[in-house]
């Protein structure tokens, strides 16, 4: 039995435990987690099905522009899809359509698509809707720290998947270039960059909704609004598969949080964060939204470290696990390893950036005190 199969069986065991707990009245809290996993189907449908339905059409439109640029850089055009889109928000489907080789399609769809795409299309726009304005600078610094290590996470994830190192390095060229441009933007114009990502995120929601409605009309009436789209049933089947895995994954994360609470809190203290920040990092493994809701109660250092960690590591035991299990089971373990390596190395960069920021703030305070004196 492969490690990927072991992970699936583990999810199934926790799904069964969650279902039993739901039947007996949610005595242990697992029943609520089981229900939450199944209920995720609605929000996943809104985010994913439209883009999956439109993927063949988007590939046809984008290919003449993307293919020459990426092939000139020695990379596969599939990398373009998940530089901008999350794996579970249509990035995987678009990567498969654009891919020139199956390996590059999987590398882009399952590994890069669980790190770079989600940051741009989901993490930043969603975080901005939750966090306070005074925390924007911590968001920008955290995202900057996290993006620096995405190529490291992709490299390790690709090697664990057994892809050729030459193929990995070639395909990382455009990623490193895009990451460098984003980092420069966040360094010099953080507010402008963040605003740009938000507009892009809203644009993706519009396209996804159009795709969903066009697919629904075709399914229900037989009328083709957009020629060349994939049947909507394909996207709905993927979403259903993800929800089944999430029913187990959410139960697993719930148990991990309960059992390993003390050691995880100790780890937070070692990193120099308060307890809320340590809890935020644990929550991020399933979903980054609760972490962003807790951000206001974290210390400065904890805010930066949490956001940095979330860039690669968010959803590793949540949506991204569910999605990968549904579309490419062989990529489960490489995806988990890649995301965790990206997240842990981002924490190291985040600590450095936080120390730098806190030193600057201290120097400013001392100057202000001297001026007042």
Swiss-Prot record:
Probably involved in the diffusion of protonated ethanolamine (EA) into the cell at low pH. At low pH most EA is protonated, and this permease becomes necessary. Contributes to bacterial survival and replication in acidic macrophage vacuoles, but not to bacterial uptake by macrophages. GO terms for cellular component: plasma membrane. Coiled coil: none annotated. Its main location: membrane. It holds the Pfam family EutH. It is a multi-pass membrane protein. The chain crosses the membrane at residues 5-25, 38-58, 61-81, 111-131, 143-163, 166-186, 197-217, 236-256, 307-327, 331-351. It catalyses: ethanolamine(in) = ethanolamine(out). It is found in: Cell membrane. This is Probable ethanolamine permease EutH. NCBIfam families: PRK15086.1-2, PRK15086.1-3. GO terms for molecular function: ethanolamine transmembrane transporter activity. It comes from Listeria monocytogenes serotype 1/2a (strain 10403S). Belongs to the EutH family. Disruption phenotype: Decrease in mouse macrophage survival 2-5 hours after infection. Keywords: Cell membrane, Membrane, Transmembrane, Transmembrane helix, Transport, Virulence. InterPro entries: EutH.
